[in-house]
Amino acid sequence: MPAVLPKHENEKKDLVEMNWDPITRIVGSLGIYTKIDFKNKEVAECYSTSSIFRGYSIFMQGKDPRDSPFITSRICGICGDNHATCAVYTTNMAFGVHPPSLGEWIINLGEAAEYMFDHNIYQDNLVGVDFCEQMVRETNPGVWEKAQKADAPHAADHGYRKISDIMTALNPFSGEFYREALQMSRLTREMFCLMEGRHVHPSTLYPGGIGTVATVQVFTDYLARLMKYVEFMKKVVPLHDDLFDFFYEALPGYEKVGQRRVLLGCWGSWNNPHFCDYQYRTMAEWGRKMYVTPSVIVDGKVVTNSLVDINLGMRILLGSSFYEDWQNAENFVREDPLGNPVDQRHPWNQTTTPKPQKRDFGDKYTWVMSPRWFDGAEYLALDTGGGPIARLWATAANGLVDIGYVKATGSSVQINLPKTATKGEVTFEWKIPKWSNAIERDRARTYFQAYSAAAALYFTEQALKEMYAGRTTTWSEFTVPEEAVACGFHEAVRGVLSHHLVIRKGKIANYHPYPPTPWNASPRDIYGTPGPYEDAVQNTPIFEENGPDKFKGVDIMRAVRSFDPCLPCGVHMFLGDGKVLETRHSPMFGAVRQE
């Protein structure tokens, strides 16, 4: 939608406005509006906007809470199973039901397959194109020349002698590695369907557990595919390490691209059935037993790993969003089940009333709200870093996870992969990086693929132990209460995911899901704090060699895509005519845009 960025007093007259709307090779409708200082080669200003309205929190009201997994999975056509899983966790708490261990291991296996599938296809078939030969040649021919001369340090592991060979292998559709990654995505999708029935809207997930019929053959079929993926990881991790390390060497200062203050959120993933009873009063304890540790990370340090603290600190701010304020609306929850006060800005108390209007970057400009985490003094604009960097950072720093295949050390995560068809045992170690930036977000995605594969090996072993012991039940009965307050915490592929439920008279009175997109894509809030996309792009240096006339914005795109943006389609709304100051480039990759 056309729009004009606001003018400011004393603004440099040589700033060039450049807009990318929609951003390609992501999911959904995301626009990035910038002002670029080509003289000093940096982004001076950035606004992130989405032209879609999601109405799930409205039409969930009055529904049977047992239907919430099936309804919420339709929020997204990419990570719908993450929503379904989180809804199951939420209703388990509301109904007071504890699923059998085998059911939990099956859910963990399904979610592990989802991480492997989605991170793989995004890393090497979507964001990977930003680093392919075609893109580098067009934007940084000097870097391409260096790549042709640069030996790949781990060529023996991945088979590509020069860095330029890796870039060529990432070319869309023609690249060898690009095509290989597509094949692996098919395998991992099959793995998911073995556990949860259908991708991406599970047919077997249900409050109380899962309806999958567990047999040794099902786990054998899963494991056969998993071992192929494990072998693939032994190639993928060193390949990406070589590629990303090269960019630091070829472009000194590239660590500043997409860099922001380390403010990371991770809500934890993969429940441990030996500890998780889904009771709110014990949530802090069983949350710490997850196989990905929940945490809020501020300036690189863990400030809490308690899901109760995480829940109570959530605030949904407005400021630049197209919604009515609900400060004086109904208060659904005054205290949590432990007696702690609950703020009116908490998702339990949110009332969603859309207020469509013309996009105005000086006022309201997006349908995304501004979730913040209140630490008692500041409303922190946490990001997920696309998911993996927050998960690995939180798990590494806490040092709680140790399952043999994966071990958190306090400063790193060790990933131990067993012998496969053609490769021996391999140990990878992800170390907490110096920065939260574009390159490190992308690097973490690769390591978390390996982490997920290693965790899946452990989950398979645990599931088979249940089978061999004769404990084959996967679901527990429950009764829907007349009144309940509940929440569920999980990690969607792209990061933090929480569902917040209030039941009255046996029906849903209020339901608010908070996936990673509102956290990452949030706009400036009532205090003027920019959201993570905006913050990461603002002041990012420009390394692209093209001038304004042929500018593609590859550094900006790398910064944005490193978050793995996902703004799936809801209700599309056109909000006025506006005026285009100047659009220099719209990256449609060969497609002709019809006006």
Name what the model sees in each region:
Residues 2-595:
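Metal/cofactor-centered catalytic core regions of large enzymes
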